[in-house]
């Protein structure tokens, strides 16, 4: 009987995926524990929204720089060191929570430092995917990484974070810190060197940044996808930054059941990751992208209009599945269309816009909740805006195909009609 052995490329993908999965589990625990910790220090919706804004603000400040850096160094090493840095920051936060010396302002500082390390870890990790998966398996690989993100951050991290916070407030932060250590150790199994253009003549960081931005400026499809991605992030974060208040105040859930609510979202996210490649095969990338944005909007609008826990949980699952499908399409388009040596810089520019829109949306969402009187109303507004965004995407992409094209064609701005 023949024994099937995995290829070196398969094993490298497994090591990177394992590290990403554990890192996402740690991140998921923190994404629930930090807002819950914040609600013990303040119940002001603007201050709660400011926590999300603080976590993502580094993408506005350092996203481009992080992208340029990961195009100059070994990407595996950059990801490893960033995970170690995140572990240290959360370890110090654990001590603050345990001793009772934590304040909302210290929470903001920790969130800012974590977000800064995340710009390196995410840029490096995302740029590694084509190197370990290959162009022919990008759709499948991106679906696996999306599934790992949803499984870790929502399906497991959410319930673990809320349950352990209810037991002992410092416990989830301890698990969070340990998880990033494990994620860093797993990267040691990723053999090979991952420095782009190794051996090339040294260049100035500023020149590298300019080269990446010039390439993006001459790629009309990527420009449109960046705009659509940024608007999707902004309109979605209006509501997502208020999720903890929506669950605790509008739905009257407890801290522990908030994790179960997130668990349903995890189920939807996993379904979206599993179905996305099949949907792309059946319909193409563009219908999945546009339809996914529209369904996200309908789900959030429904959550705002029908504030019943079971209905809201189901709709949140629908939202999670749809947003994962959207993310798979966007990630695959980036990897397929951007040259490998420019991937870090283009990703940095992309994340600066898309993830930089998140703190803006979070702050606006906090203001909307204060103005309208409930987080549920903010969900309704967010949903209607996302439905409108789906219509905008139809117009913006009407002359373009999202099927993989050689990077040089995009560099010339090649267009194709449907």
Give the predicted meaning of each segment.
Residues 1-418:
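Alpha-helical transmembrane-bundle signature of multi-pass membrane transport and export proteins
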